[in-house]
Amino acid sequence: QDVVHSFLRF
């Protein structure tokens, strides 16, 4: 799981 990419998915 990518937590950093989870909120950086913009």
UniProtKB/Swiss-Prot annotation:
Could you tell me what this protein does?
Increases the force of neurally evoked contractions in the major power-producing flight muscles, the dorsal longitudinal muscles and so is likely to play a role in sustaining or promoting flight behavior patterns.
The modified positions for Pyrrolidone carboxylic acid read Q1
Q: Which residues carry this modification: Phenylalanine amide?
A: F10
Is Metal-binding found in the keyword set? no
Q: Give the UniProt keywords, A-Z.
A: Amidation, Neuropeptide, Pyrrolidone carboxylic acid, Secreted
Similarity-based family: Belongs to the FARP (FMRFamide related peptide) family.
The name this protein carries in UniProt is FMRFamide-like neuropeptide
